[in-house]
């Protein structure tokens, strides 16, 4: 089914206000969920909203909490999220990293006691739109087996790197081949995954999203490489924030909350003039996209460049929402 941006935001706002969330907080949160969905990231927008409300109802999320700065070391700051709403807190933290970068050339905010930030790419994009390089990542509850194991002991720990090119170039990737949100998107659409995404119950690689969702044997990106990167990202976020690791979140909390996150902004224009920056970025992009194609029907893509088209299509033709997901939201 198709809905407008206003219908989508209105549905989110209604549910949030029914939980006695303050009007300004409900409006800002609903706006972010709707913008994520409008941008084509359904897995962490509309599809994720019922799960967000479940955690809100369970008390994992404290909607009136205010993040507090704990430590300030020039370009580096440490904050405690106080388990406030995840997407609103993450936006504020990247804004703060940008402010620090304006003063120091680089800004790093390490956040502890945070909630799920929904679409991590929103915060990298936020920096790149203002001309900064944006880098951020989060740890999570253990939802992926380390390479060589059957039992979940590491997080998917998504990493975002956004570059202020025209259009913005951005990698937004989980340390698994697919996020659990994308497994859900493919399952709801009745599609197999385009490549192997995990193991079946017999330990064989599989493209069936429902099987992986059920047994939790999701495949690390690049096999042992994604597993290793997940581990070191967790370690850095834990140390810089003095927050909880994947192990602590998993063993000590009843659900995924109290996670640790990193937000970095770099002011490129302090290091290179605008014309040179643009020319160098364009040369990189042209060199890549003019390579001979392996398949004439498959374009060579640069990461993140598809979002401009997805956003335009959704604004022109309406936002696609799965019927079953919309029914869940209407019932909240």
From Swiss-Prot:
Record's catalysed reaction(s): 3-dehydro-L-gulonate + NAD(+) = 2,3-dioxo-L-gulonate + NADH + H(+); 3-dehydro-L-gulonate + NADP(+) = 2,3-dioxo-L-gulonate + NADPH + H(+)
Statement: the UniProt record of this protein carries the keyword Transit peptide: no
Main location: cytoplasm
EC number: 1.1.1.130
Keywords, comma-separated and alphabetical: Cytoplasm, NAD, Oxidoreductase
Record: residues binding NAD(+): 168-174, 224-225, 304-306
GO CC annotations, alphabetized: cytoplasm
GO MF annotations in UniProt: 3-dehydro-L-gulonate 2-dehydrogenase activity; NAD+ binding
Active site feature: 44 (proton donor)
Localization per Swiss-Prot or TrEMBL: Cytoplasm
Leader sequence residues: none
Top-level taxon of the source organism: Bacteria
Record text on subunit structure and interactions: Homodimer.
HAMAP family (UniProt xref): Diketo_gul_reduc (MF_00820)
Family: Belongs to the LDH2/MDH2 oxidoreductase family. DlgD subfamily.
Function: Catalyzes the reduction of 2,3-diketo-L-gulonate in the presence of NADH, to form 3-keto-L-gulonate.
Protein name: 2,3-diketo-L-gulonate reductase
Organism whose genome encodes this protein: Salmonella paratyphi A (strain AKU_12601)
